[in-house]
UniProtKB/Swiss-Prot annotation:
CDD domains: FBPase. This is Fructose-1,6-bisphosphatase class 1. It comes from Dichelobacter nodosus (strain VCS1703A). The gene is fbp. Keywords: Carbohydrate metabolism, Cytoplasm, Hydrolase, Magnesium, Metal-binding. Gene3D superfamilies: 3.40.190.80, Fructose-1,6-Bisphosphatase, subunit A, domain 1. The lineage of its organism: Bacteria, Pseudomonadati, Pseudomonadota, Gammaproteobacteria, Cardiobacteriales.
Length: 336
């Protein structure tokens, strides 16, 4: 079975212009994933150190968990060690970080990341994940990066991926040429290629949404949920409702089995809740590379021009036929 390192070296030939830089960044992600995986696996043993709240909120207004901070620092250290990264932005910090050194000024790439998605699930041993996104900077080489570098539409990503920490730990990523998954073998300390050229089934029978917010959803989403619940055996309905509360875990299951994930706008979240740059863009890039679709319900996610670092958006992603059906319902039942 091919290791992640071997895979990266093999694929490096596809990006001669990168001169190994992209491969090096993915290696940094791999290193950070191992550190985060170790801390998560020890969570129940050293609970006072890694479980629970930091007693403060992050920029999103969410309670910051200890493991959020550990994961953030692990990713930050891994990226700072690279000569080819000019700066990064994290869901956990209000402002982006420019690596204000000569090597940082001369670096070509910037990173956006959600260090630990679903961290509130840690203390009940539910799967969580890390999400990352890589872009070419747009400001001149030799200068510090600016906000402009981080406010790029998702279709300009050159790589994106996630790590899911569950019954096994997997790194799934794309560089714009399909999606591949690597499972961590702790006995070897190595990620091994276990899921090659992943494709999302065109249709599925799983819908994932927090139905506790049903009364606050748009009419089109309400109608689609009822459609999923209808008894129509000839169309393989009712569908299964599966919602973990960790975007990475829900997305990962649906990508492998076929399904759709929804986090629409709601009366209490009129612009949606998920972050465009840290969560939606990387997952949308992965989904499209695997043959899926990602939309707000009205617009392709990867076409949105971000206006702010922590901009939120409605998010619907998954199997092509299911997402298109939701778009039909949204168009048919507009909210006036």
């Amino acid at each position: 079975m091919k290791s992640l390192g071997e895979f990266i070296i093999e694929k490096q030939a596809e990006y001669p212009q990168a001169k190994g830089s992209l491969s090096g960044i993915l290696s940094a992600v791999r290193r950070a994933a191992k550190i985060i995986n170790r801390d998560i696996n020890r969570a129940g043993v050293v609970s006072d150190l890694v479980l629970g709240s930091m007693g403060r909120e992050n920029v999103q207004g969410e309670t910051q968990m200890k493991l959020d901070v550990f994961a953030h620092e692990a990713m930050k250290a891994a990226f700072y060690s690279r000569d080819d990264i000019a700066g990064f932005a994290s869901e956990e910090e209000e402002e982006f970080t420019a690596f204000d050194t000569e090597r940082g000024h001369n670096a070509k790439y910037i990173i956006l990341m959600d260090p630990l998605d679903g961290s509130s699930n840690i203390d009940v041993n539910v799967s969580v994940g890390s999400i990352f996104s890589i872009y070419h900077r747009v400001t001149p080489i030799g200068t510090p990066v600016t906000l402009e570098d981080f406010l790029q539409p998702g279709h300009k990503q050159i790589a994106a991926g996630y790590i899911i920490y569950g019954s096994s730990t997997m790194l799934v990523f794309t560089t714009g040429n399909g999606v591949n998954g690597f499972t961590y073998d702790p006995s070897l300390g190595t990620f091994l290629l276990s899921h090659e050229n992943i494709k999302i089934p065109k249709d599925g029978a799983i819908y994932s949404i927090n139905e506790g917010g049903y009364l606050k959803f748009p009419q089109g989403i309400k109608k689609y949920i009822k459609y999923c619940q209808e008894d129509a055996p000839e169309e393989h309905r009712p569908y299964k409702s599966r919602y973990i509360g960790s975007l990475v875990a829900d997305f990962h299951r649906n990508m492998l089995k076929g399904g759709v994930y929804m986090y629409p706008q709601a009366s209490n979240y009129p612009n949606g809740k998920l972050r465009l740059s840290y969560e939606c863009n990387p997952m949308a890039f992965i989904a499209e590379q695997a043959g899926g679709v990602a939309t707000t319900g009205h617009e392709r996610i990867l076409d949105i021009q971000p206006q702010a670092l922590h901009q939120r958006t409605p998010f619907i992603v998954g199997s092509e036929h299911m997402v298109n059906k939701i778009k039909d319902f949204i168009a048919q039942y507009p909210d006036n």
